[in-house]
Amino acid sequence: MFAAIQPGLAEGAQYPGSLPPGVCQPDLQPDNNSNFVESAKDANKNWHGVPGKVDPILIRSSSESPSDNQVFQATRLPEAGVRSPPEGAEIPGAEPEKLSGASSVCSPLEDIGYASSSLSIDSFSSSPEPVCDTPRGPSPLDPLLPSVAQAVQQLQAQERYKEQEKEKHHAHLVMYRRLALLQWIRALQHQLVDQQARLQESFDTILDNRKELIRCLQQREAPCRHQDQG
């Protein structure tokens, strides 16, 4: 938000040789290479400042090209004096480059336990808990399946046997009915023969009786004729 520009580094600086009003003099401390750099801590040992993009003009020196160590220090010097404003005092018209750089870069200097914390609401809501479902392997065959298949086969065999028995019973029934019909026809034939025999006997008896009657009548007429002639 409010960045301090180092004197002599930026060309055409507004305050050459001194810091602008409202910016404290940074505390210079030697690093591992005995180079004095600004401290990244404040009086309360709080890390501040976000390493962002640095203009190449700030890295370039007027006398000679800096070494890699000096370039690395120069890239960190402008951001060391940046002070974060109090909560609620953010500038709505901040540069999009700084905002995007601050939101995308994450270093140990700015990570105080909240940026990568798994207890934050955003990380908890955006990354749901993985479902601890162990992948199940191919389940073994149920021991009841062979018995069920065997029972089904037995039922099918019983059904076929019943159908065959029904067909046999129907054939036997038809045959028995035919035999009964033949026996009834034969019985009728025997009865018819008996009736014919009885009728023949009756007819013969009638004929015999008729002959006897005729003979008796002839015998009676013969004496009467003798008497008339005498």
Curated annotation (Swiss-Prot):
Which portions of the sequence form the region Disordered? 1-103
Locate the compositionally biased regions of type Low complexity: 85-94
Q: Where in the chain are disulfide-linked cysteines found? A: none
Q: Short name of one Pfam family for this protein?
A: DUF4653
Feature: compositional bias, Polar residues:
60-73
Family classification: Belongs to the UPF0500 family.
| The name this protein goes by in its record | UPF0500 protein C1orf216 homolog
Query: Whose protein is this, by species?
Result: Mus musculus
